Amino acid sequence: MQKLSGRKLLLIGFTLFSMFFGAGNLIFPPDLGAKAGIHFWPAFLGLAISAVGLPVAGVVAVARAQGLEKLAGRVHPVFAQVFMILIYLSIGPCLAIPRTASTSFAMLAPLVGTGAGLQLGYSVMFFAAAFLVALQPEKLTRWLGRLLCPCLLVLILVLFGGCLLHPLAGQYGAPTPEYTSGAVLQGVLYGYQTMDTLAALNFGAIIALNIQAQGVTRQEEVQCSTILAGFVAGGLLLAVYAMLGHAGALTGAAVPGLATGADVLTVLADRLFGKAGLVLLAAIFVLACFNTCVGLIACVGEHFHTLVPSVPYPAFAGFFAAASMLISNLGLADILRLSVPVLNALYPVAILLICLSFVPELEQRHPLVYPLCIGCTALQSVASALPLGPLSALAKALPFGAVGFGWVLPAAVGILAGMLLRPTPHEP
């Protein structure tokens, strides 16, 4: 087969959506809706740019470059290896994978209890099941695309349908002070926190494996199908974010002052369906977290198997699942203190790599733009994210530094310098 059918392409898109859509993606839109109130839709536009547009652009950029290693290698081959390892570890066993179990258990706890033994037993079953599903990374479509993602979407539609039929308020409420003006920018900043753009750089390889497992062998067709799957996943993210955000805006109007998106969803589910609503919400969280966990275990295991082919993929997948289980129960808080600053340092670099990749022939015409732009950005983002004393204070004092965008000016300087300078020719 040289081309995917529409149905199979849709399944691949469902698979990618389910890998993206974790607990944070559930929590952020209703929280945004509750806080933005009558300014929800302008804020949603900003959220769509940073939480949907950037991740989809990341999938497209990696597919066009034929892999993250080639994309990051435009800076330097050594940079590519270090960057990839840091990303895989940060969004994998050092942060995102352990949090899938701890977050989903937190939503189950009101129903089953909060004992340490219960959490340990849950996490063992959770990661064992995720490991078994991830054992065949090229067949994730069978589980995520065909079964688990449709189940998740049906449950979300039930919750949203209840909100449509029995809204908690007749109209949106008053916005919080930060959304009174500049709601679009606030939405961009809020969507920026999902950090799905980093995940997008990693998911492309697994999606390509699943496309090839459908019988597609031509590299051009794999690339095209990956890009189309990215747009399918982006469309689903946009629709689900809109539903959750609208529900959050009405819930926030009915019950002002809710602290988090999880609180918003809990109030919504409880008022619509009572205890059955809390069971529904817990099922949504467990499914969303499980899907993301499977995708991340597959991505991290496949990458390290590629680095060390002598170690089989199941060994890496099992190791990362077991390590994540231990971290989620024993040392998650300590790991978060280390991994979150690393993620904050990596994120601007990832955004710039994606943006630069869409400039035609940039690498050929101005080969220094990539290393200088990424180098300047990395210096600022590392100094801003890590406690480096006066250097950190200087990095945060740059324009837009107060809102986490202090890297914009160094990136612009790097781009300008890269366009003006020429590499020194090597002596024969």
Cite the ranges covered by each PLM segment.
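Hydrophobic, membrane-embedded alpha-helices of multi-pass small-molecule transporters
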Residues: 11-21, 162-169, 177-244, 280-289, ...
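Selective recognition of specific alpha-helical transmembrane segments in multi-pass small-molecule
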Residues: 53, 57, 151-163, 226-252, ...
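Membrane-interface loop-to-helix entry segments
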Residues: 135-163, 339-351, 370-379
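C-terminal membrane-solvent junction of multi-pass transporters and transport-like membrane proteins
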Residues: 351-416, 423, 427-428
